[in-house]
């Protein structure tokens, strides 16, 4: 109820659950906000992960989560949940921030999220909170290792941003027969320097999709990654997008150019250059349709209760509610679904709970 109604606090949940539909839903009195917060510290985190696992299997059987161009994609990325100068817990990370010329200790939590990406659906599968002295890569390894042990066939290719060209990650994936496709942007890396030296003046592949023209370079069998002893492939894409802007009473066109470089273990004989570029941009799904949606529309950018178990459990419950909500949207007739913004459907759910409460006032 907390997440499906997009409530901002346990206090709001307590008020909503005291009367009307909230009370009928619970069939008993709603606990106070303090009781809910205390109970969230002892929630069954493995049980919540098991619920997400059953949902993943059901979505697969119902052909909701399907492969993209013959491959199952997953994205892993880090996210900072919130920060504070005053409140902390034993699992908080710390950093020094200069405020008005004075250094202050800031406490914060970061987490790594694992998302499955399909052509028409995305599913947030798991969540790992960083320990006090962890970096994002260490937490990501724990998360990926747990996913591989629990759901060994849920993905073929793992996508990641510029923090994930790490030998330990590539080795783990290759040990399990998986491939990596991650952004390569550190100009100090010998791998990127060597790849740029091999990119010719003319692109090896050009194509167009919508308003964007792609010029691509593809180099295989690079072995200049000292800590990773297998050969890798580097793909570069220079993308020019034509944008239209309205100034005063007329439209003006301008071009915007961006460059992307990816390193991957995928062989060119199995996945062509254009598909690598397409898959590489799917990484943004976890930013645009994951974190942005959860923070801006689901109010996940703050602590409901500052406790590590509570944070993990509530985010896993958020993943469950997120999947249920988007499954509900898929079952609405397209003509009706497209006529209303997504947030309106969330407000309608809240109204379903509020109307009985108002009618009984």
Task: Provide a role label for each language-model segment.
Residues 13, 32, 36, 70-84, ...:
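Short, conserved catalytic/metal-binding motifs centered on acidic residues
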Residues 37-119:
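Active-site-proximal, Lys/Arg-enriched surface segment
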Residues 96-154:
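Electropositive, glycine- and tryptophan-enriched low-complexity nucleic-acid-binding patches
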Residues 134-191:
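Domain-level cores of phosphate- or acyl-group-handling catalytic modules
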Residues 179-283:
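An anionic, glycine-rich sequence signature occurring as long contiguous blocks
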Residues 208-215, 220-223, 295-361:
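A short, flexible helix-boundary coil/loop motif
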Residues 270-305:
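Short amphipathic alpha-helical "interface-anchor" segments enriched in bulky aromatics
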């Amino acid at each position: 109820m907390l997440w499906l109604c997009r409530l901002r606090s346990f206090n709001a949940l307590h008020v909503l659950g005291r009367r009307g539909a909230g009370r009928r839903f619970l069939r008993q009195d709603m606990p106070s906000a303090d009781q809910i917060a205390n109970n969230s510290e002892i929630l069954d985190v493995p049980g919540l992960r098991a619920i997400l696992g059953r949902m993943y299997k059901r979505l697969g059987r119902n052909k909701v989560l399907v492969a993209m161009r013959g491959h199952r994609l997953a994205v892993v990325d880090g996210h900072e949940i919130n920060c504070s100068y005053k409140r902390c817990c034993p699992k908080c990370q710390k950093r020094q921030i200069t405020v008005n010329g004075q250094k202050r200790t800031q406490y914060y939590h970061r987490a790594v999220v694992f998302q499955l990406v399909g052509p028409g659906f995305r599913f947030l599968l798991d969540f790992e909170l960083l320990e006090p002295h962890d970096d994002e890569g260490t937490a990501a390894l724990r998360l990926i290792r747990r996913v591989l042990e629990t759901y060994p066939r849920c993905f073929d290719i793992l996508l990641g941003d510029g923090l994930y060209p790490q030998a330990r990650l590539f080795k783990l994936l290759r040990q399990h027969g998986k491939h990596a496709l991650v952004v390569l942007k550190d100009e100090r890396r010998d791998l990127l320097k060597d790849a740029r030296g091999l990119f010719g003046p003319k692109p090896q592949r050009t194509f167009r999709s919508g308003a964007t023209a792609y010029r691509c370079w593809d180099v295989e069998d690079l072995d200049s990654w000292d800590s990773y002893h297998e050969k890798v492939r580097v793909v570069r894409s220079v993308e020019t997008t034509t944008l239209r802007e309205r100034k005063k009473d007329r439209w003006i066109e301008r071009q915007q150019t961006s460059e992307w470089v990816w390193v991957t273990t995928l062989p060119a004989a199995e996945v062509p250059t254009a598909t690598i570029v397409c898959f590489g941009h799917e990484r943004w799904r976890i930013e645009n349709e994951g974190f942005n949606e959860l923070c801006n529309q689901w109010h996940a950018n703050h602590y409901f209760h500052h406790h590590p178990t509570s944070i993990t459990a509530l985010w896993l419950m958020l993943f469950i509610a997120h999947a249920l909500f988007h499954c509900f949207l898929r079952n609405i007739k397209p003509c009706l679904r497209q006529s209303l913004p997504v947030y309106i459907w969330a407000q309608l759910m809240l109204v379903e709970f509020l109307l009985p409460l108002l009618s009984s006032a």
